[in-house]
């Protein structure tokens, strides 16, 4: 059996321990490695000729990407998970206790358990390569660093910096890591091993004291000051998580107890808290998202189809969506993009949009001005169909007008090659209708981005009846290169995300008309776990956009999609939301919120002809909106709009911010139980009408006591 860890000795007395997990592209830490590492450490202790040890990865572009998350599923109880953490503590403590200098030579991803391994070394040197990133992202999986990270990190970089890293899961670049004291040196990859060897030969060095601001020195240097830091962090966490995520509070407690009672006590608390989190429903849900997205990256979107290489893209329309799509095409996918718009203003807007985003990277020192300029050079513009003939894909982002989109299809078929894909960024028009104008309908597909394009991770790839498998696979691969998470959905009004969102938004509007206040509605859904409330979302998306989509959905999908009368009243008062500075909330000049705390525009109640009454329980408000979304998600599965519950969960989480700790609509239905959901829906149906009627699939599942997962 091939070993993961190989020890070689140099003539100068430095031993090199290379980690290379057989058959894997990246190194991950597995439980079964414990005995192998302990055996090697015993060998090192016995060999007096070894003067120093360097840890390095045998993989091309990663140090250690973290612990193997799948081993957590083998933990049947909290006791199993605690034993796993304690095993890590034993091995890392043994490494740290070696009486020779131990240096970690880091190139590529050094995350989670990988960084904890590096922290147990006496010194760290990393490459200055763009692929080198250091961090502890466990919180994103509902966990905490369980290999001593909550104890070693604050002792190395300071409490405030360590908490920031652990509570956000952010990844740190090499120069930043050096500045904060996380690594001792940053060098080109070509001399990484040589530098690590020299550091080991120079002998153990105590870490340089981290430069801290005067305030941090005063706070971190006393027990009283540390308590202020922990109390402030706890308050911020409670506000941000709304009590829905247990991991951040436990991370703070680990650091707090470790700093007050010593490393050993801190490690005991870490192992206990880690164990509780591993078996929590929140972490199980977050890990299911991780596994789902990992699995999806291996899929082409169309079985058996091979994607064609996209060497050039054309974007039709230089508006907000067009500019955003062009930007992610050039900056993320590194694919040349030609933007076509009928007027120069649209083109200058698209260029300006991309430049501002890249310039932020320069200001944050994530890239050099030369890199920014090279990426900008990938974007070109035109007001006519010039320089588009060799496009592999054309993404159309013009107005939601069927006749206009038909014209675009005809233009592209005339101007481009026979294999050029025509991808429409429509949010509501069925793709089959757009494809009616095509002589090559197999090349027509939907590619629905969400706004703002550079921030929203999801894209819906919409296949109509005649879309070819090759077109689907090529479009999915293109979206992935843009840094997106694509889900393939079938054609139909609203596709998946807007369809489930529409009923949720309609119900919120209905509650508003019944006298629930705007702030209360938004607070209730934020407390439930959404990033923003439904009324804020309507202001952001645009009340006019909602009003345009609603009748299309009602025509195609029936009476339950009938929008409340609120839209017409608001539009007749010229309220479109943030875009024109007039909506449910007040906006100052320049369309910026007048203060950090949003203020409701009280005059909107008069426009709607309502008077806010007594607010219902927040949980009742949230339930009424959310059950509509859940019911419709199951209908979408039944109608074949989405291929699987997994895709439905990912679409809702990444497309509309469905609370990740619930795992997505389908995971949440399993948690509630289909029988309980049916009872809730039937109760509302009796009270408010047939828009709450449970769909047939849910009734069957309730009767048969079945689950989605």
Curated annotation (Swiss-Prot):
Q: Which GO biological process entries does UniProt record here? A: fatty acid beta-oxidation
Q: Where in the cell is it found?
A: Cytoplasm
- GO MF, one example: long-chain-3-hydroxyacyl-CoA dehydrogenase activity
The reaction(s) annotated as catalysed by this protein in its Swiss-Prot or TrEMBL entry are:
a (3S)-3-hydroxyacyl-CoA = a (2E)-enoyl-CoA + H2O; a 4-saturated-(3S)-3-hydroxyacyl-CoA = a (3E)-enoyl-CoA + H2O; a (3S)-3-hydroxyacyl-CoA + NAD(+) = a 3-oxoacyl-CoA + NADH + H(+); (3S)-3-hydroxybutanoyl-CoA = (3R)-3-hydroxybutanoyl-CoA
Alphabetical keyword list? Cytoplasm, Fatty acid metabolism, Isomerase, Lipid degradation, Lipid metabolism, Lyase, Multifunctional enzyme, NAD, Oxidoreductase
Which biological pathway?
Answer: Lipid metabolism; fatty acid beta-oxidation
Name the site position(s) for Important for catalytic activity.
Answer: 116, 138
Per the UniProt record, which EC number(s) apply here? 4.2.1.17, 5.1.2.3, 1.1.1.35
Cysteine pairs bridged by disulfides in the record: none
Does the keyword field hold Glycoprotein? no
**Which cellular component, as a GO term, is one annotated location?**
cytoplasm
Provide the residue span(s) of the region labelled Enoyl-CoA hydratase: 1-188
InterPro entries named in the record: 3-OHacyl-CoA_DH_NAD-bd, 3HC_DH_C, 6-PGluconate_DH-like_C_sf, ClpP/crotonase-like_dom_sf, Enoyl-CoA_hydra/iso, FA_oxidation_alpha_subunit, FadJ, NAD(P)-bd_dom_sf
Region annotation 3-hydroxyacyl-CoA dehydrogenase: residue ranges? 308-709
Q: Which domain of life is it from?
A: Bacteria
NCBIfam families in the record: FadJ, PRK11154.1
Q: What does this protein do?
A: Catalyzes the formation of a hydroxyacyl-CoA by addition of water on enoyl-CoA. Also exhibits 3-hydroxyacyl-CoA epimerase and 3-hydroxyacyl-CoA dehydrogenase activities.
Q: How does it assemble?
A: Heterotetramer of two alpha chains (FadJ) and two beta chains (FadI).
What protein family is recorded? In the N-terminal section; belongs to the enoyl-CoA hydratase/isomerase family.
Entry protein name: Fatty acid oxidation complex subunit alpha
Q: Please name the source species.
A: Shewanella sp. (strain MR-7)
Primary gene name: fadJ
